[in-house]
């Protein structure tokens, strides 16, 4: 499988974040269950960008910059099925709860992040490089995970609970059924917790959260009223200097979903990760590759799954071939990472990009 050049040449908390997750989080399932959770290349690239610090950022312990210390206020990941979005998001939730997510200045010689100074008894120490951004725990975290239903939110919640039980985080994160208690210092029962939000469970909507995680935002639409929930949670985070991350499969451009609105936003403080094969892979005549062509399909799959070492392209392609016998659009959307309309027809080349560009020009 060809791998892209994921080169991190900017100041970021992503290095300490990734190292922290490897030390504290565990692989939740499969044959490696219980092993240290190590990010795939594409995951680290997204983590590094979410943790990208503004070079001019300064640190005042009494008045921290919070989300304004970072280049990106929020992130979006559009990726095909089985890329590892759920377990990775679970690890990022753990990090947001008890890891060094806040910018805490620039390291000098000898500076370290020490778990024993941050409520964790595992003994881990991360030595910073001089000039590297440093991190600290949030003093009173309130985190929400949103999905369309209980079954959908389980894509994150299930690996999250497993990660906690399999490693050192079981002393810091205490699952309590519908929420997870974070062992902290605030003593506030309404803070220091991780909550789940769905279409039918919105009792804590509007809370002053510091981090929000949205699963399958391609399914949040105006008709199911989840765009309203999506924006309400983002407002709650913005008021507290918080941040958010959304993950999804390729969206249906006929639905104007939350994922589509994020992708079409012109805000420069949103990090977007989407390996769109129709923009990157073209024939000599300029037309995108066809999923019906065996050789071109293989190149599409290799491109969109780049950086995911656990993926077996032969297995993915075998499932695609069977799906294509009855519903080619599913194969193209969920595995080919392409925009496919609900009616099953793939968008003509350049149509979505052209409409998007026209809308932006009209709004200017």
Range-by-range predicted roles:
Residues 1-364:
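Phosphate/NTP-binding elements of NTP-utilizing enzymes
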